[in-house]
Amino acid sequence: MNEKTVADKMFLRTAKSMLILNGEAHPGVVSQMPKEIMTDKGPADVVLMFARNRKELEHFFPIAKEALGDKGSLWIAYLKQTASKATDINRDSINEFAKENGITGVAMISIDMDWSGLRLKRIEV
């Protein structure tokens, strides 16, 4: 059985543009993303943001939100509580922070042993 790639789990097949923020946090995942849809500015169909802690979440989130297309998906990759590196964020704290900023979690994936990804969309008003 073939293992799904991170790009497959993120449903990138229909995305026409993708922006990655703080990719140096996990270059292995960044290297798996489809190069043909990469962009360095928004609006983007998909924004993938890496946050190792609350400080990075608060720093990169406004940039990600600004770059996100109206119907786009924001993926926040974060360290699992069981990861070898300490973190002060988790799915619930990220979703709470995002909701305060008009975006809500809709799905989750496991990226690898140390990282998870939370998919978020703009809250419809």
Regions found by a protein language model. Give the residues of each.
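N-terminal, charge-rich interaction modules
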Residues: 1-28
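Positions that flank functional sites
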Residues: 22, 83, 113
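Short, charged/polar "capping" segments at the starts of alpha-helices
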Residues: 25-30, 84-86
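Short acidic low-complexity segments
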Residues: 35-44
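Short, glycine-rich nucleotide/cofactor-binding loops
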Residues: 47-57
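Mid-chain, well-packed structural core segment of small domains
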Residues: 58-92, 97
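Class I S-adenosyl-L-methionine
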Residues: 102-125
